[in-house]
């Protein structure tokens, strides 16, 4: 349950991709969705939905950056100024309070997790509180934090118990103790006060941001959370400060969508959603596997493993559905996506970057240099027997801010008979998807989805796993001199922020909660950062 709580931040916001707009405007959670489809798909009352969909007086593009978590985006001063206006901060707070009152105890399914509807605004308000925090001199704390440098635990030198040939004088005295374990980390070795300079951990912004992260509404009840709390108390004692805080009770998470009853204020009969695993159902182990071990054992990519478990270390504590096994490759030397596409091509088929990304939708790192050490999916032969060669798709902003496709795309995966030929965009169906989740992801109603995929029956019982489904038609092009046209292949890349494996060097730690638990499995010294600047961390010398 704890890991499901923590994974909610990543899983639930497949609904919210419509925030990336072409012009600045006020923000509404479900602005482009059909109301009837939302009420049916989310199992919410019309009054709760109306409260959730209240227009918030914030720059829509700026608020959209909060949806996946403040740490995913590298914020500039302009970004912060666009978000942190008095009107926006006040409007977000009012929205949260109104949803809590109107939706009360109604529940909904987000990313196969049943949660309280009042939880949906909290990611925005919690992350806006992080980004908009200022110190007593009115400096933006979050901007400052992006330059802070982080550290792994202090560790024993891995060679301290080895002899130098016949010379035993190099062996440390501790090695003679039969109870000594070179992998043990003492409290002093893990203490934040020994990992950072006092000038940093007593910094006003450091303390306030640390405290704010402890107020995270999705902070799980785990040993690591206990560690964070203990370390905050230790830091405060060293800095002679007393900042009150209280962690959130785990009341927002209700359960998983499998065999779980969801209710709303207007529902008179119970509805049950049962998920079916069409991939590999993997049982958790007492001695859980690291990401690399999990991927090597079940032949899945590192990105898929992290997204499905919702955990950077790929920890899960209940039976979990992973994709079917495929051929994987261990990536070294931080190649670009283009270089990997070339590497995976053969004399018969030329793999494009778009195809590589369609196989690795959760690739770790930036496409200018993906994270070394991760397992990436590759294909000796194409899905369906051939490697399609997708053309670049020309897109432009439509009237509602949604992309408009002027040329037909080529599916990177097989499609079912009945998919329209003039399809502008495809989506790969993965485990856990149904027609409702696809509709919500792309702002469609079921009639539209059936129009683009005529084979779909009335109950969506014939949606096939690992097949592409059409999610947008081609629109007849009109002549315009006012629209800037963008050429897109598989997806937009965030070149400024790399999500990098913690097992490798350099590694990016996305937030303070992630600094330590994923580094304790690292046997070699690594480079870690709280913001974007990496430093080398040397092993502790005894």
Swiss-Prot record:
Belongs to the secreted LysM effector family. Keywords: Chitin-binding, Glycoprotein, Repeat, Signal, Virulence. Might have a role in sequestration of chitin oligosaccharides (breakdown products of fungal cell walls that are released during invasion and act as triggers of host immunity) to dampen host defense. Residues 327-378, 425-471 form the LysM domain. GO terms for molecular function: chitin binding. Disruption phenotype: Does not affect radial growth rate and colony morphology, nor lesion development on apples. SUPFAM superfamilies: LysM domain (SSF54106). This is Secreted LysM effector LysM4. The gene is LysM4. It comes from Penicillium expansum. Induction: Highly expressed during the infection and development of decay of apple fruit. Glycans are attached at residues 53, 59, 168, 223, 238, 299, 346, 391, 445. The LysM (lysin motif) domains are small globular domains involved in binding chitin in eukaryotes. LysM4 contains 2 LysM domains. In plants, chitin acts as a microbe-associated molecular pattern (MAMP) that is recognized by lysin motif (LysM)-containing plant cell surface-localized pattern recognition receptors (PRRs) that activate a plethora of downstream immune responses.
């Amino acid at each position: 349950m704890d890991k499901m709580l923590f994974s909610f931040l990543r899983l639930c916001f497949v609904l919210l991709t419509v925030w990336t707009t072409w012009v600045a405007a006020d923000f509404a959670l479900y602005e482009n969705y059909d109301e009837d489809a939302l009420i049916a798909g989310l199992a919410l009352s019309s009054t709760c939905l109306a409260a959730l969909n209240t227009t918030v007086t914030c720059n829509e593009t700026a608020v959209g950056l909060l949806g996946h978590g403040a740490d995913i985006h590298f914020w500039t001063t302009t970004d912060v100024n666009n978000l942190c206006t008095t009107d926006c901060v006040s409007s977000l707070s009012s929205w949260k309070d109104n949803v809590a009152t109107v939706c009360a105890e109604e529940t909904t399914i987000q990313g196969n997790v049943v949660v309280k509807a009042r939880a949906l605004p909290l990611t925005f308000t919690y992350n806006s509180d992080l980004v908009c925090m200022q110190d007593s001199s009115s400096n933006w704390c979050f901007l400052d934090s992006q330059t802070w440098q982080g550290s792994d635990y202090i560790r024993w030198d891995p060679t301290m118990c080895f002899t130098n040939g016949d010379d035993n004088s190099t062996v440390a005295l501790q090695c003679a103790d039969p109870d000594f374990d070179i992998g043990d980390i003492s409290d002093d070795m893990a203490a934040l006060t020994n990992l950072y300079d006092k000038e940093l951990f007593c910094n006003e912004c450091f303390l306030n941001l640390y405290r704010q992260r402890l107020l995270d509404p999705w902070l799980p009840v785990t040993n690591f959370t206990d560690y964070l709390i203990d370390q905050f108390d230790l830091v405060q004692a060293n800095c002679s400060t007393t900042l009150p805080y209280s962690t959130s009770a785990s009341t927002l998470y209700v359960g998983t969508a499998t065999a779980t009853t969801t209710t709303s204020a207007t529902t008179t009969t119970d509805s049950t959603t049962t998920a079916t695993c069409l991939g590999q159902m993997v049982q958790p182990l007492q001695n859980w596997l690291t990401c690399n071990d999990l991927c090597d054992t079940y032949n899945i990519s590192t990105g898929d493993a992290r997204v499905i478990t919702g955990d950077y270390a790929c920890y899960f504590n209940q039976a979990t559905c992973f994709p079917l096994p495929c051929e994987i490759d261990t990536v070294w030397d931080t190649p670009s996506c283009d270089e990997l596409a070339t590497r995976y091509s053969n004399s018969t088929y030329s793999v494009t970057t778009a195809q590589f990304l369609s196989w690795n939708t959760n690739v770790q790192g930036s496409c200018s240099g993906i994270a070394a050490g991760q397992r990436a999916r590759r294909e000796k032969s194409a899905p369906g027997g051939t490697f399609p060669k997708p053309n670049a798709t020309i897109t432009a902003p439509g009237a509602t801010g949604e992309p408009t496709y002027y040329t037909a795309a080529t599916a990177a995966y097989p499609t079912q008979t009945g998919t329209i030929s003039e399809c502008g965009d495809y989506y790969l169906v993965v485990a856990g998807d149904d027609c409702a989740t696809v509709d919500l992801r792309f702002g469609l109603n079921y009639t539209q989805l059936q129009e683009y995929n005529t084979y779909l029956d009335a109950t969506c019982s014939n949606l096939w796993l690992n097949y592409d489904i059409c999610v947008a038609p081609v629109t007849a092009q009109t002549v315009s001199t006012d629209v800037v046209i963008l050429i897109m292949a598989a997806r937009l890349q965030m070149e400024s922020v790399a999500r990098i494996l913690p097992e490798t060097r350099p590694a990016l730690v996305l937030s303070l909660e992630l600094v330590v638990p994923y580094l304790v499995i690292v046997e070699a010294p690594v480079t870690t950062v709280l913001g974007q600047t990496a430093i080398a961390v040397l092993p502790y010398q005894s």
